[in-house]
Swiss-Prot record:
UniProt region (Disordered), positions on chain: 119-165
Protein name: UBA-like domain-containing protein 2-B
Classification via CDD domains: UBA_F100B_like
Protein family according to the UniProt entry: Belongs to the UBALD family.
Gene that encodes the chain: ubald2-b
InterPro entries: UBA-like_sf, UBA_8, UBALD1/2
Amino acid sequence: MSVNMEELRHQVMINQFVLAAGCAADQAKQLLQAAHWQFETALSAFFQESNVASAQHHQHMMCTPSNTPATPPNFPDALAMFSKLRTSESLQNSSSPASNACSPPGNFNPYWASSPPNQQPVWLPPASPTAHLHHHHHHPQPVWPPNSQPTGGPQKAMAAMDGQR
């Protein structure tokens, strides 16, 4: 009975390994046997082996893991794919549906949340005494610190602001 339990335990470990690593059952069995059925050791060996294999550009046939949280994508390959995508996008004309789907329209305004220049912003009430200050672009800019202003500076600024009211 213990032999059957041992075989069952091994089969369960093989199945778990296949799910965790995304490889074939025969490869999982070989790795587990080589690691004396130590699951973590076999899993570590599998991922070290897959890193070596990808560095050697897949010289021998091997089952690569699926893209799971435990197995991030191969970043050099992903970067190469993105650079190819960028190159192919620049070769297309701007009227193609693919480039239109990936690019903003020609009249795209990054300040879409700001109000139009000739309309009052929505967040200020129309009767606000300061609303007119947002539409006149000739009012003087404040100078800081106040000590650096020439004499009469504060009076000039106040007179200019009073003149706008």
